[in-house]
Amino acid sequence: MDIQKTMREKAEAAKRASRALAILPTGVKNEALRAMADALEKRAELVLEANAQDLEEARAKGLKRSYLDRLMLNEGRIRQMAEGLRQTAALPDPICQGDYSTIRPNGLEIRRVRVPLGVIGIIYEARPNVTADAAGLCLKAGNAVILRGGSEAIRSNIAISSLLAKAAYKAGIPEGAIQFVDFTDREAVDVMMHLRGYLDVIIPRGGAGLIKHVTENAAVPVIETGTGVCHTYVDASADQEMAISIAVNAKASRCSVCNAMETLLVHQDIAAEFLPKLMAAMTAKHVVLRGCERARAICPEMEAATEEDWSTEYGDLILSVRVVDDLTMAIAHINRYNTGHSEAIITKDLVNAHRFQREVDAAAVYVNASTRFTDGFEFGFGAEIGISTQKLHARGPMGLTALTSTKYLIYGEGQIRE
């Protein structure tokens, strides 16, 4: 099959659909989202059967536990996908909403309103739930979407996208608005990245390798959803029990996600008291700790951390630990090794808390809370399209507004520019 020809045909169909979607009434979009949710729940067995085949093949390939967790679907996760679509339907429609208006001295009335981006390409890896989340958000924001998931989840993604596209079409969404690329050949990604004039933006979601490849090679504008080398710094004044609770949640509640903690920093003044408690709590959750020399002097059972560990997103039950001199050293470490995702400080010192939030360069900066909250649902955006770690167009969890652009509407009464 001619991949380039097929991809261009998909892009042309999406472009046609996007023009109709841009002016579709909110009620039609919401009805389609609810129909898509119903279809997922009613045909859950079809999705689970496809997912079981994907999982069987992934296990045979020896893929690691964290990858299998991202790939795995069950009835609960399918219900979450359906609920995400219903929550998206319940969110306010950003399209045509005004966020600025003025009347100029010459009488011109100027308004700025939200409009869809157009056609969005999503390139992602193991998570089949992204198929539903992305399709729902793009549709609600008036965008057509072309989805290209990872080869390991191909059966799951085909099942989900087929159900969603059929349900949406029956509910009044233009044909071609939701499309899935069923080629597993990497050539499809390369072709997709060069569909300038058809795709308005590409959003990659996945590991560092995928994101680097897309950002360095795409001819289409890219919104970078970064990897998550997230830190928690335990300050000298921290409530240590709170710090342990937050650290365990940030690392062990779901270690494969991008908002999980990868490195814990602790102030030298409390390290001797705090680290044995941390070691016990993490060991109980089967987390392997890799420490700096100062940390291992306190807890010799820690593995030795290398320079590479400080910049590694493990996606697994592994945690790097470093003892730092003070807040200044903690901030310097974070700004050197982080990926601009989510960072946290545990402290009772408000001056230190405010300084940490000012000086740490990240999309989300927490005081006395787990980094695991960096998520569209938790931020009240509904499902998210991804978590942007770049600073242009969008940053942090990207909900509906991040999938729109702006248009200026100007009303005059015959004015001409002198």
Segments predicted by a language model, with ranges:
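N-terminal Rossmann-like NAD(P)+-binding subdomain of aldehyde/semialdehyde dehydrogenases
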Residues: 1-110
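Flexible, glycine/charged-enriched surface loops at secondary-structure junctions
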Residues: 26-27, 95, 171-177, 255-260, ...
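ALDH superfamily catalytic-core signature
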Residues: 126-129, 133-141, 159, 163, ...
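Short beta-strand-to-turn element immediately C-terminal to the catalytic PLP-Schiff-base lysine
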Residues: 233-237, 265-268, 324, 345-348, ...
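Short, well-ordered beta-strand elements within core beta-sheets of diverse protein domains
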Residues: 17-23, 264-266, 316-325, 340-345
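Rossmann-like NAD(P) dinucleotide-binding subdomain of oxidoreductase/dehydrogenase enzymes
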Residues: 90, 99-237
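C-terminal core of ALDH-fold dehydrogenases
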Residues: 31, 327, 332-417
